[in-house]
């Protein structure tokens, strides 16, 4: 994915920072996967592991951002190289926030287990669907970056709409349960917080896809409609 330069050290610097970012992405994706497994099975120990690993992601964000700054100062890159470094600096911020959302899911899971909630008490199929979709989007967004594949980003944008629909479907389910049983209100609010975190993960995965388009085409596609974004990704 890196264009060759006269300086082999410059190539090595760019490849190194890209590899670090992808490693951070791998860890973040693992965090989300583990957080969803903990939530789906109401596993407090698994949730605790997610919370313990959060600091590793925070440290990586700081280290990678510093490395991007160092390369810009030393090499004064232009054109796509500069866009790449600027995008990585923003991508790691989104990845760190995905890690924060995974931690929120873990915290909600711990509260649910402490309250004695059981996985079978309510229909969580929409939540599981949204979680699986968010993990898939995150994986594909990282793959599209690695291969600078803008065409793959179009489906990621469409899938974000699917997550939003699943979120609203789950909220309707929660409201029904809480109306029927007021003792479910506290549990329902924790599930709502977890669902909102999943929705936000989908948003961050979409941001990652947008940065791939920016690197390749130099077009800032933030704040445009999903239809326009998908069209830009495919042209």
Swiss-Prot record:
Which GO biological-process labels does this protein carry?
Answer: intracellular phosphate ion homeostasis; negative regulation of phosphate metabolic process; negative regulation of phosphate transmembrane transport; phosphate ion transport
This protein's major location comes to: cytoplasm
**Top-level taxon:** Bacteria
Where found in the cell?
A: Cytoplasm
Q: Which family does it belong to?
A: Belongs to the PhoU family.
Q: Partners and quaternary state? A: Homodimer.
Q: What is this protein called?
A: Phosphate-specific transport system accessory protein PhoU homolog
Upper lineage ranks?
Bacteria, Pseudomonadati, Pseudomonadota, Betaproteobacteria, Burkholderiales
């Amino acid at each position: 994915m890196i264009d060759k330069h006269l300086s082999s050290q410059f190539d090595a610097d760019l490849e190194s920072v890209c590899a670090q970012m992808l490693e951070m992405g791998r860890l973040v994706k693992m965090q989300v996967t583990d957080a969803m497994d903990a939530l789906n099975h109401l596993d407090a120990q698994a949730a605790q592991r997610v919370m313990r690993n959060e600091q590793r992601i925070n440290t990586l964000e700081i280290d990678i951002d510093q490395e991007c700054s160092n390369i810009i100062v030393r090499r004064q890159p232009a054109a796509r190289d500069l866009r790449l470094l600027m995008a990585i600096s923003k991508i790691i911020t989104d990845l760190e926030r995905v890690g924060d959302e995974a931690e929120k899911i873990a915290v909600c899971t711990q509260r649910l287990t402490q309250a004695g909630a059981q996985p079978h008490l309510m229909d969580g199929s929409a939540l599981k669907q949204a979680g699986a979709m968010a993990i898939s989007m995150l994986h594909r967004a990282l793959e599209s970056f690695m291969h600078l594949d803008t065409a793959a980003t179009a489906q990621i944008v469409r899938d974000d709409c699917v997550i939003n629909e699943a979120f609203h479907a789950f909220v309707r389910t929660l409201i029904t349960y809480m109306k029927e049983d007021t003792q479910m209100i506290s549990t329902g609010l924790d599930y709502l917080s977890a669902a909102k975190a999943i929705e936000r993960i989908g948003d961050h995965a979409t941001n990652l896809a947008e940065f791939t388009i920016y690197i390749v085409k130099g077009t800032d596609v933030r704040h445009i409609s999903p239809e326009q974004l998908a069209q830009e990704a495919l042209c």
